[in-house]
């Protein structure tokens, strides 16, 4: 089984390093920066450490490899596809691990589907330096099952998400809205807590509200409650914005939350649920989708 990487940055290096430790040999790679005066040194050092052979062009990888990993920045992944699509062949596996949008992954599939190649949209959901090739991957596309079949025996952790290219990337990017968003909220929250000398109290109070409760329960409670009480909570957030500004802090995330609450007012959920209350997040999201 010949494995090749187009792009040899952090993702390709860590995956190839892990696969090498599992016993896979003969991995090849290429990188647009491999001959760069400064960045090329890192590419060559990484390849040497992982026992990977560097080759000159993308096409060399595509013509040689049974599994082609496209591991370039998202802005270049379509260019790579267009560069190698004439070299792709039936039964070959093309795995794109870039953090591209679902639409880009769909466009890649449209560009290559007539070649007979198997395509896997592979979204990495963990720490590459820590997990190496065992980083959790969600994969979709007509080649996702083959990707799982070939690489799980070598320690890769692959979860399937259907045969539609773009589904795996959608999972990754939607998840990022929450994970990156809550991290930004944590920073803003603790800056404000620190400014007013109430850090310990805030941590204890929020912990009491959140600890030990399943995420699904939080989701149902917060989405339905916000829909019903968006106007009052937006007014409260106005005070939070003023407080942050008085402390010389940037209230950007709080302003975004305030605007999000205000945007719900047009649906008038409080009037809809006078006699009964919504209990599931789906009730709110479905109503917004239908009336948007």
List each language-model region with its residue ranges.
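Rossmann-fold dinucleotide-binding core
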Residues: 100-180
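Conserved beta-strand segments of alpha/beta enzyme cores
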Residues: 26, 53, 93, 118, ...
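Short, basic/aromatic-enriched C-terminal tail that caps enzymatic domains
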Residues: 274-292
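Helical "substrate-binding/catalytic lid" subdomain
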Residues: 171-277
């Amino acid at each position: 089984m010949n494995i090749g990487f187009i792009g040899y940055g952090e993702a390709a290096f860590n995956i190839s390093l892990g696969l090498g430790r599992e016993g896979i040999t003969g991995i090849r790679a290429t990188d647009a920066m491999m001959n760069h005066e400064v960045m090329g040194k890192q590419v060559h050092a990484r390849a040497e450490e992982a026992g990977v052979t560097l080759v000159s062009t993308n096409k060399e990888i595509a013509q040689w490899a049974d599994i082609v990993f496209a591991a370039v920045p998202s802005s270049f992944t379509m260019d790579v596809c267009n560069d190698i699509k004439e070299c792709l062949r039936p039964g070959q596996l093309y795995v794109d691990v870039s953090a591209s949008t679902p639409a880009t992954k769909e466009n890649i599939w449209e560009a290559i589907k007539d070649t007979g190649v198997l395509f896997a949209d592979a979204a990495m959901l963990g720490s590459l330096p820590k997990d190496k090739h065992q980083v959790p991957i969600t994969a979709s596309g007509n080649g996702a099952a083959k990707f799982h079949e070939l690489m799980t025996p070598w320690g890769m952790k692959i979860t399937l998400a259907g045969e539609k290219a773009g589904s795996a990337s959608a999972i990754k990017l939607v998840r990022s809205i929450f994970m990156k968003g809550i991290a930004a909220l944590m920073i803003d929250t603790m800056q404000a807590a620190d400014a007013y000398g109430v850090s310990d109290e805030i941590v204890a109070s929020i912990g009491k509200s959140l600890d030990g409760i399943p995420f699904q329960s939080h989701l149902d409670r917060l989405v339905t409650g916000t829909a019903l009480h968006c106007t009052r909570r937006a007014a409260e957030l106005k005070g939070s914005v003023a407080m942050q500004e008085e402390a010389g802090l940037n209230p950007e995330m709080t302003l975004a939350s305030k605007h999000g609450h205000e945007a719900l007012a047009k649906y008038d959920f409080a009037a809809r649920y006078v006699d009964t209350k919504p209990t599931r997040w789906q009730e709110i999201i479905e109503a917004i989708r239908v009336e948007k």
